[in-house]
């Protein structure tokens, strides 16, 4: 079943509007939506209850209500989830977390970034990378750092739609492609 992107965007914008500028509420909601989305993707029973036309609306709302209570989702946000279930568009739950995070980042002019290196990186170098990219992109970047030994050396830096791959692995792949052209 295809996700209705217009409906998804409407729900996300409504959530952000009712939550306002409260960064803590937005962050907690984002985390709860991550868990809800993961539950939807991984638990076929939950997904079947939400999507099944044979399950009554009352049963769907009861099941969703129990889950939302466990996730400590703000009261203001719950009606939007129930609206999706009522309109038979419960499948938006699988993409709700990404769309919500994207709109929150846009709202606060922040971007999630990732630095992947072959070896540990010190804070000083990370801050230099962050400063350069923030000036280039014009937004605040929140980095997560990962290690991947398969890179051999160098780094892969991702921030929003910006990707910079300076890894030795990538260099070797490019070299291989250029040598096999002849």
Swiss-Prot record:
Gene3D superfamilies from the entry?
Answer: N-terminal domain of the delta subunit of the F1F0-ATP synthase
Q: Which GO terms describe its molecular function?
A: proton-transporting ATP synthase activity, rotational mechanism
Protein's cellular compartments: Cell inner membrane
Q: Does the keyword Nucleotidyltransferase apply?
A: no
The record's listing under Pfam families reads:
OSCP
What is the membrane topology here?
A: Peripheral membrane protein
Q: What do the Gene Ontology cellular component annotations say? A: plasma membrane; proton-transporting ATP synthase complex
Q: Which InterPro entries match?
A: ATP_synth_OSCP/delta_N_sf (IPR026015), ATPase_OSCP/dsu (IPR000711)
Instruction: Supply the alphabetized keyword list.
Output: ATP synthesis, Cell inner membrane, Cell membrane, CF(1), Hydrogen ion transport, Ion transport, Membrane, Transport
Quaternary structure note: F-type ATPases have 2 components, F(1) - the catalytic core - and F(0) - the membrane proton channel. F(1) has five subunits: alpha(3), beta(3), gamma(1), delta(1), epsilon(1). F(0) has three main subunits: a(1), b(2) and c(10-14). The alpha and beta chains form an alternating ring which encloses part of the gamma chain. F(1) is attached to F(0) by a central stalk formed by the gamma and epsilon chains, while a peripheral stalk is formed by the delta and b chains.
Q: Which family does it belong to?
A: Belongs to the ATPase delta chain family.
The record describes the protein's role as: F(1)F(0) ATP synthase produces ATP from ADP in the presence of a proton or sodium gradient. F-type ATPases consist of two structural domains, F(1) containing the extramembraneous catalytic core and F(0) containing the membrane proton channel, linked together by a central stalk and a peripheral stalk. During catalysis, ATP synthesis in the catalytic domain of F(1) is coupled via a rotary mechanism of the central stalk subunits to proton translocation. This protein is part of the stalk that links CF(0) to CF(1). It either transmits conformational changes from CF(0) to CF(1) or is implicated in proton conduction.
What is the protein name stated in its UniProt record? ATP synthase subunit delta
Organism listed in the record: Sulfurihydrogenibium azorense (strain DSM 15241 / OCM 825 / Az-Fu1)
